[in-house]
Amino acid sequence: STLISSFANRSLDVADLVSLSGAHTFGVAHCPAFEDRSSRVRHNPAIDGKFATALRNKCSGDNPSGTLTQKLDVRTPDVFDNKYYFDLIARQGLFKSDQGLIDHPTTKRMATRFSLNQGAFFEQFARSMTKMSNMDILTGTKGEIRNNCAVPNRRVRTSRPPSPARGDRR
């Protein structure tokens, strides 16, 4: 419910939440980000036992600075598809927030639908991405279109034009 209200505060609805979470069909997470899912709890019905054991085995021991990672989608980690939702139904969601989609009555129906109908997932994902891409657009000097999203573009001075090169007759 916290995610539902967080999304609602940004004018995004439950369909947006469930479909945009499907982006977790790609990518990895560092072990510390999901250690709450793989902790040594005797029986945690919120996670598949074998999956929890595999996560625990992978992330325990020598893990300097949390460098070990786990793929977010255990079935098809390098394909954009609806198998992420199968992971959730099988109780193999890496994050609590992901697994919560199949456990919460408001989101369960849509997550299940996306597991059964990849086309419906793709259509809603496209609508939700478009909706999200139009939110809080920064223009002018407040924003920039980056060449590399992780690195701010180099700032260029525009206060005065560059001086002409020697021999240039402007």
UniProtKB/Swiss-Prot annotation:
Role according to the record: Removal of H(2)O(2), oxidation of toxic reductants, biosynthesis and degradation of lignin, suberization, auxin catabolism, response to environmental stresses such as wounding, pathogen attack and oxidative stress. These functions might be dependent on each isozyme/isoform in each plant tissue.
Protein name: Peroxidase 2
Glycan-bearing residues: N9
Positions of disulphide bridges: C31-C59
Keyword Phosphoprotein applies: no
Binding annotation for heme b: H24
GO molecular function, one term: heme binding
Reaction(s) this enzyme catalyzes, per UniProt: 2 a phenolic donor + H2O2 = 2 a phenolic radical donor + 2 H2O
GO BP terms in the entry: hydrogen peroxide catabolic process; response to oxidative stress
Enzyme Commission no: 1.11.1.7
Pfam family, one: peroxidase
Species the sequence originates in: Hordeum vulgare (Barley)
Cofactor comment text: Binds 2 calcium ions per subunit. Binds 1 heme b (iron(II)-protoporphyrin IX) group per subunit.
Enzyme class, spelled out: oxidoreductase
Keyword ATP-binding applies: no
UniProt-listed SUPFAM superfamilies: Heme-dependent peroxidases
Binding site for Ca(2+): T25, D73, T76, D81
Similarity comment text for this entry: Belongs to the peroxidase family. Classical plant (class III) peroxidase subfamily.
Keyword tags: Calcium, Disulfide bond, Glycoprotein, Heme, Hydrogen peroxide, Iron, Metal-binding, Oxidoreductase, Peroxidase
Cofactor(s), by name: Ca(2+); heme b
